[in-house]
């Protein structure tokens, strides 16, 4: 028999302490997982880059000219990752998946893997002599048409969906401010009645419901060998094969290309997750940030998708001069446009913070509380 007996009040107190302790342990495990996720992801990517470079050094340590060519292939991957179609597709899908409660840090990785799979296969075919540089005109033309069509169509569809969502979010935002609604339940109720367009277009967003669904999309995007980086990589690989290099020697170039591209595209999706997480701390802030970024997404997707679509039309119909010269120039410098898109989203995030604090939180007398987690610091790699 126990030397004492617990009263009902003591039992309730003990049960409450145990519940709080369990909740604290779950919170700590969640925090640890949030910190470990990006570290594991980027640790693996950095390891992949190191392995690719170790492979290159093992093959070409005594051939500095070829090592310089290997460096060029890796830089091609870094540069190709910031092509405008990559950035626009990844950022839009990350925003969509964050809406459903996901943390799609790896969306950029899967997109890059799908994209680089095409390059790896094409390089292998070249190295094996199945396709020669002089006889791949038809294959290149078909691949270019498919890749450009998929890229332009996807971005224009995304622009149309985001435009409908932007109009709906704006109506919801105005209604929330007019009615003074700031609680999550109230905003969710408003968001559930955003009109027929959002309900009709919802299934299109559900086509990409997990980060790995970006792999086939990246593969389709990669079918167009019409960018300078991809053509340059294939030329490097073909030149080495023509000099009598083995398959292992040639395949190191697409490996370096893929490693560099995956690193940058994954960094892009991870940074976007961090940006969206800031917005999701407060329901009203979430709505405001969605409004800001959706507007930027519409502008970016329309601009890039329009450039690609018009470029495709111009090439098919042999149009030249005037505005078509400008369109050709823009299509040839999409990597620079991609860097501008990253800058645009960063500026939109900063403006969203400043305007929210001055116009929204300030006018309502509510402090813009911040939630500082180690995940936020880790994700901003």
Swiss-Prot record:
Please give the superkingdom of this protein's source: Bacteria
- Which chain regions cross the lipid bilayer? 40-60, 64-84, 111-131, 150-170, 216-236, 244-264, 293-313, 334-354
Single Gene Ontology BP annotation: nickel cation import across plasma membrane
Any idea where this protein resides? Cell inner membrane
The main location class comes to membrane
The UniProt GO MF terms for this protein read: high-affinity nickel cation transmembrane transporter activity
What's in the GO CC field?
Answer: plasma membrane
The residue spans the entry assigns to the Periplasmic side of the membrane are as follows 61-63, 132-149, 237-243, 314-333
What family is this protein classified in?
A: Belongs to the NiCoT transporter (TC 2.A.52) family.
Q: What is this protein called?
A: Hydrogenase nickel incorporation protein HupN
Q: What organism does this protein naturally occur in?
A: Bradyrhizobium diazoefficiens (strain JCM 10833 / BCRC 13528 / IAM 13628 / NBRC 14792 / USDA 110)
What gene name does this entry carry?
Answer: hupN
């Amino acid at each position: 028999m126990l030397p004492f007996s617990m009263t009902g009040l003591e039992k309730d107190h003990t049960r409450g302490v145990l519940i709080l302790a369990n909740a604290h342990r779950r919170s700590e495990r969640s925090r640890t997982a949030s910190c470990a996720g990006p570290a594991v992801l980027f640790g693996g990517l950095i390891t992949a880059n190191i392995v690719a470079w170790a492979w290159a050094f093992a093959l070409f340590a005594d051939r500095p000219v070829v090592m310089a060519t290997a460096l060029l292939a890796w830089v091609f991957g870094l540069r190709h990752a910031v092509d405008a179609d990559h950035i626009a597709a990844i950022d839009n899908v990350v925003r969509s998946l964050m809406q459903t409660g996901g943390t799609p840090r790896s969306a950029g990785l899967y997109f890059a893997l799908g994209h680089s799979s095409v390059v790896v296969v094409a390089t292998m075919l070249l190295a094996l002599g199945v396709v020669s540089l002089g006889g791949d005109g038809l294959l290149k033309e078909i691949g270019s048409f498919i890749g450009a069509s998929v890229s332009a169509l996807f971005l224009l569809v995304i622009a149309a969906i985001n435009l409908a969502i932007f109009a709906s979010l704006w109506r919801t935002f105005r209604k929330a401010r007019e009615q003074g609604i700031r609680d999550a339940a109230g905003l969710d109720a408003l968001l559930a009645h955003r009109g027929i367009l959002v309900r009709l277009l919802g299934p299109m967003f559900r086509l990409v419901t997990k980060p790995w669904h970006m792999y086939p999309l990246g593969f389709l995007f990669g079918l167009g060998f019409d960018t300078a980086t991809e053509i340059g990589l294939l030329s490097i690989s073909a030149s080495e094969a023509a000099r009598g290099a083995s398959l292992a020697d040639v395949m190191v170039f697409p490996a370096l290309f893929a490693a560099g591209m995956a690193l940058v595209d994954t960094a892009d999706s991870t940074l976007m997750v961090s940006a969206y997480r800031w917005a999701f701390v407060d329901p009203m802030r979430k709505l405001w940030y969605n409004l800001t970024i959706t507007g930027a997404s519409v502008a970016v997707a329309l601009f890039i998708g329009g450039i690609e679509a018009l470029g495709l039309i111009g090439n098919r119909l042999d149009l030249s001069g005037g505005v078509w010269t400008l369109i050709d120039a823009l299509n040839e410098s999409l990597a620079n446009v991609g860097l501008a898109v990253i800058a645009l989203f960063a500026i939109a995030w900063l403006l969203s913070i400043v305007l929210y604090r001055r116009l929204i939180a300030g006018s309502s007398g509510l402090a813009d509380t911040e939630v500082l987690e180690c995940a936020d610091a880790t994700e901003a790699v």
